[in-house]
């Protein structure tokens, strides 16, 4: 298994779309900045055929220190969730490991 990084995405844009390396890096950075900004505002980000990102507020809840067993509150927080689209799930499920999808 390998890891796909932002630098890898920029390199793929350079190779497949023909952007120069600086433009490709800027496109990737801008893409993720826009997603982050939308999530910070509380918007839902829907990427058709891929999935949805959204923020959820998690309330404070009781917790326990694993070392001491002492009860302590876990603070309220905001978390990002991702739900894959049915299309993405089907494509990933149908793909054989090590062979990229042709779509």
Swiss-Prot record:
<dbReference type="InterPro" id="IPR000119">
    <property type="entry name" value="Hist_DNA-bd"/>
</dbReference>
<dbReference type="GO" id="GO:0006310">
    <property type="term" value="P:DNA recombination"/>
</dbReference>
<dbReference type="InterPro" id="IPR005684">
    <property type="entry name" value="IHF_alpha"/>
</dbReference>
<comment type="subunit">
    <text>Heterodimer of an alpha and a beta chain.</text>
</comment>
<dbReference type="InterPro" id="IPR020816">
    <property type="entry name" value="Histone-like_DNA-bd_CS"/>
</dbReference>
<keyword id="KW-0238">DNA-binding</keyword>
<comment type="similarity">
    <text>Belongs to the bacterial histone-like protein family.</text>
</comment>
<dbReference type="Pfam" id="PF00216">
    <property type="entry name" value="Bac_DNA_binding"/>
</dbReference>
<keyword id="KW-0805">Transcription regulation</keyword>
<dbReference type="GO" id="GO:0006417">
    <property type="term" value="P:regulation of translation"/>
</dbReference>
<keyword id="KW-0233">DNA recombination</keyword>
<dbReference type="GO" id="GO:0030527">
    <property type="term" value="F:structural constituent of chromatin"/>
</dbReference>
<feature type="region of interest" description="Disordered">
    <location>
        <begin position="55"/>
        <end position="74"/>
    </location>
</feature>
<keyword id="KW-0810">Translation regulation</keyword>
<dbReference type="GO" id="GO:0003677">
    <property type="term" value="F:DNA binding"/>
</dbReference>
<dbReference type="GO" id="GO:0009893">
    <property type="term" value="P:positive regulation of metabolic process"/>
</dbReference>
<dbReference type="GO" id="GO:0006355">
    <property type="term" value="P:regulation of DNA-templated transcription"/>
</dbReference>
<protein>
    <recommendedName>
        <fullName>Integration host factor subunit alpha</fullName>
    </recommendedName>
</protein>
<dbReference type="GO" id="GO:0005829">
    <property type="term" value="C:cytosol"/>
</dbReference>
<comment type="function">
    <text>This protein is one of the two subunits of integration host factor, a specific DNA-binding protein that functions in genetic recombination as well as in transcriptional and translational control.</text>
</comment>
<keyword id="KW-0804">Transcription</keyword>
<dbReference type="InterPro" id="IPR010992">
    <property type="entry name" value="IHF-like_DNA-bd_dom_sf"/>
</dbReference>
């Amino acid at each position: 298994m390998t890891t796909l990084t932002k630098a890898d995405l920029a390199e793929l844009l350079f190779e497949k779309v023909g952007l120069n390396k600086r433009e490709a890096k800027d496109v990737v950075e801008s893409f993720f900045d826009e997603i982050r900004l939308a999530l910070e505002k509380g918007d839902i980000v829907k990427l058709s055929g891929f999935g949805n990102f959204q923020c959820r507020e998690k309330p404070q809840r009781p917790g326990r220190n694993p070392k001491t067993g002492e009860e302590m509150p876990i603070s309220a927080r905001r978390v990002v969730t991702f739900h894959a689209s049915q299309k993405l799930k089907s494509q990933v499920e149908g793909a054989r490991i090590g062979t990229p999808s042709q779509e």
